[in-house]
Amino acid sequence: MFKVFITNLGKYTEGELVGKWLDLPCNNITEELKSIDVRPNSKYEEAFITDYENDWNYNVGEYENIYSLNELSKKLEKIQKEGSGSLYNEIAHLKN
């Protein structure tokens, strides 16, 4: 399990909390960001992470890249499903 609470940064600085829990991995992060009114080339272009939960004891920073976290969660999910052999392969891949 990997969840992050994404928050619209612009609205937050205006005093309004607009956000939602996002389960990772997610197939369409862009649509999820649009659902909290975060869009490229608009008044509200940025989101940040205000809370998180995961089974991996991974500390998530406020401004971590949501797309990178999504990729990480895909790998962690794969490792969890496939077992330690997959973990070895992922570590070997990271070293190269």
Residue ranges and their predicted role:
Residues 1-41:
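N-terminal ordered "arm"
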